[in-house]
């Protein structure tokens, strides 16, 4: 069955290449998505869930919520009030953080990724389209070690500061945080998310920030 499905995928991709209606990037993304689905032993029919089962799943979720009474059931953000309202971050949720420029959006999402990866040991992928991975790690080290970032930039550090920095560096280095500053398009981010999920089992994806993402001409609106 898997071989037949693979043959069907390759036939469809070949036809799309000959038709030339989609650009190369879109075809590559679709190819990867279809083959990844085969690797996960999934296909369109097995993804179908009867409405009755969906209703039961929803009722079970509501029943579980009534038992937990607002306790965090997803990935905690570290912000008490936010966790109470959301009960954590859950699979398939898309949450947008919106604010005026220079209001601390990057710092906010970085704190969430930091808490999830360092405090709760979740696998987190953070895509940074503005800051380099080195810049982000430097900010994380300043936060975790409680050493002034300006002192880190100038190198004006005491022995005690170095001890704190090394402790912070060890915590970050042993975590499941993935920082990627190379993906710039929607297709690249999707592709890497699939790979990171398969390889590292990521539970949270953070993108900073959406306006800097680019897309292929045929999928720019998406």
Short names for language-model regions:
Residues 209:
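Walker B catalytic acidic pair
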Residues 212:
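Residues immediately C-terminal
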Residues 115-201, 215:
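Cytosolic-facing regulatory segments adjacent to core modules
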Residues 2-9, 13, 20-27, 31-34, ...:
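Helical mechanochemical/support elements of P-loop NTPase systems and associated helical scaffolds
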Residues 1-68, 92, 98, 102-103, ...:
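Short, small/acidic-rich helices and loops at N termini and domain boundaries
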Residues 64, 68-89:
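P-loop NTPase nucleotide-binding/switch module
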Residues 79, 87-131, 185-197, 203-206, ...:
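P-loop NTPase nucleotide-binding module
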Residues 215-221:
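Short acidic, glycine/proline-rich loop/turn micro-motifs
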């Amino acid at each position: 069955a898997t071989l037949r499905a693979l043959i069907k995928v390759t036939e469809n991709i070949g036809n799309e290449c000959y038709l030339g209606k989609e650009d190369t990037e879109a075809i590559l993304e679709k190819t990867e998505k279809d083959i990844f689905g085969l690797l996960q032993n999934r296909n369109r029919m097995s993804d179908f869930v009867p409405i009755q089962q969906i209703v039961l799943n929803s009722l079970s979720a509501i029943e579980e919520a009534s038992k937990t009474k607002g306790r965090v059931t997803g990935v905690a953000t570290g912000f008490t009030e936010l966790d109470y309202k959301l009960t954590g971050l859950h699979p398939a949720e898309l949450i947008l953080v919106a604010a005026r420029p220079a209001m601390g959006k990057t710092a906010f999402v970085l704190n969430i990724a930091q808490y999830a990866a360092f405090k709760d040991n979740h696998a987190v992928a953070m895509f940074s389209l503005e800051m380099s991975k080195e810049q982000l790690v430097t900010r994380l080290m300043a936060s975790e070690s409680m050493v002034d970032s300006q002192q880190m930039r100038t190198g004006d550090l005491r022995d005690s500061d170095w001890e704190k920095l090394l402790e912070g560096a060890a915590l970050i280095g042993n975590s499941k945080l993935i920082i990627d500053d190379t993906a710039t398009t929607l297709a690249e981010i999707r592709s890497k998310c699939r790979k990171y999920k398969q390889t590292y089992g990521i539970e949270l994806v953070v993108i900073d920030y959406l306006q800097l993402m680019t897309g292929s001409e045929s999928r720019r609106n998406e």
